[in-house]
Amino acid sequence: MGGKVSLREKFFGCIAGAHIGSAMGAVVEGWTYDKIEEKYGTLDKLLPYEHYNNGWIREPGTTEDGIERQKLMITAIIEKGDRVNAEDVRQAWLKYIKPESAGMVSEPFEAVLLAMAKTGIPARDLGRYCDYSGLNSFARSCHPIGLINAGDMEGAKEDILEVGQLYQTTNSRGLQWAVVTGVAIAAATRPNATVDSVLGAIFDYCHADMVVKELDRELKRTAHCKDFRELRKAFDSVYNGYGMPYSMSYANEVVTKAVCIFRMLDGNTRDAMIAAVNLGRDTDCIAAIA
């Protein structure tokens, strides 16, 4: 990081990195790193893939459900021309989500949330009806909220906890981890931002017990790692859950891995995407954040 990078370039790099990382990681989403290694060695390119067993073979570079969420937030921000709240993004859902999206570019629980969004339920209450309050569904897609609050970490935190209520319960674990994404992006847009300044902002603005304690533990535990092969082995003893819905997609795991990659690779977007894609488990979401 650092150097003479314009704010426009930072915006572009953030969104491009999330899109490309998601598209590359979607190919091997849910795989073990041993399976990735056996088939690709190091996966470092865009390939076709299928999701949801629906017969749609997506062309290389096609994004997935997380980026669809992000696009809706971007659209709401563009249409308002300012920071957005949960109601603003709900209106974007109602205007732009197509009925055929369910099972194609969105998770099953999102169809339920959309149906409720069409009622009189306040936008801030919708997330109460999602069964998966710790998921990374918002943490991996909330980049635009950090960007519209460029340089303002407090504003980013406030808006993450506001808009995120569309997906998860107020102040819940998933939203507290999404604050990491928003605050980090807001901090990274500052002039002369560095990896250390971004990490410092995360530690200053994120929940001390629910978030910072785990991040600090894993940053220290993986400090010796020099590449993604060392990093993924280091995570094995901590993040290894199977046998339950979305077992690989909880926000604490995905965000922590992304932050450790960011630190290890000194904020290099391309290298971070490749590392995340080859880490195994929820590869597309890790790549979107890293």
Model-derived regions: residue spans:
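Structured, active/binding-site neighborhoods that engage oxygen-rich ligands
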Residues: 1-290
